[in-house]
Amino acid sequence: VAAYYRKVLNIENFSLNTIREPGEANGKRSNIINCVDDNVKVDLGKETPESDQATMIALKYALDHLDRDEIDVLTLAPQGPNAFFTEEAGSLVEYLGKRYNTADIMSILVSEKIKMGFVTEQVKLRDVPHQVTQKNIFKKLTLLDDTLRQDFTILKPKIAVLGLNPQVNCGQNGDEEVNVIIPAIERAREEGIMAIGPFSAERFFSERMYEKFDAVLAMYYDQGVVAFKSVDEESAACYIAGLPVICSMSLTDPHYDIVGQNLGDEQGLRNALYLAMDVCVHREQNIELQKNPLPY
């Protein structure tokens, strides 16, 4: 596949070091492990069942090496909407949750200006109210707080919580705010988590209130992602929290319409790669700091 693209794009003076295992990698060259049959069909600028199958093979292969500590981090390049979807597990986040036997997993959008987690992932809007429960909000607040401390070295994270209903903007809380969101926030504060809210999403972002917080917890994906990208899309990437391994991904769409024209922007993938590297360093620092603690 790589050779095909190199030929189509007419890339000269560039060679790939084909290896079989991560330990064979040459630090001075671009290394590649071929996970699929060399005869796999390539349709330039198209997502096909064959490409989706090859994507899942590569993902499983990389995770196997990650689990064996043969690589340190995993960064996913832009993919089509069905690339990481399986009938057995569902979406990528659901697949990773089942692979590592954990339900406490969450996509966190990360940029230089804002970090955002979600109570629900990319589910149908009609299913959102059923998933916005005290238990789920508390679990996500706990996970977000732990992640900010361990993976981003923020000692006392301050987390803003968005409301579910628009009338929060008028100082009026709906049933979900009164009976679900506020009790979850109060429980989190009892556990030492600095959670504040609920805030109206419109007012929160229009008045730039996010600048006063280390992270934001949105109730559902569409509530937060558009505002997040309007604040800072240039430095953005996605981090998948709650896993024993480090996994990040680009927020950039694959843009199949410009494939082969040398018009793509690599910044989104670069952001995801640097994010994974930063988290890796932070985890190592935390491990080192927790060694040989002084007695009380």
Which ranges hold each PLM region?
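Anion-binding alpha/beta catalytic cores of soluble intermediary-metabolism enzymes, centered on
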Residues: 1-296
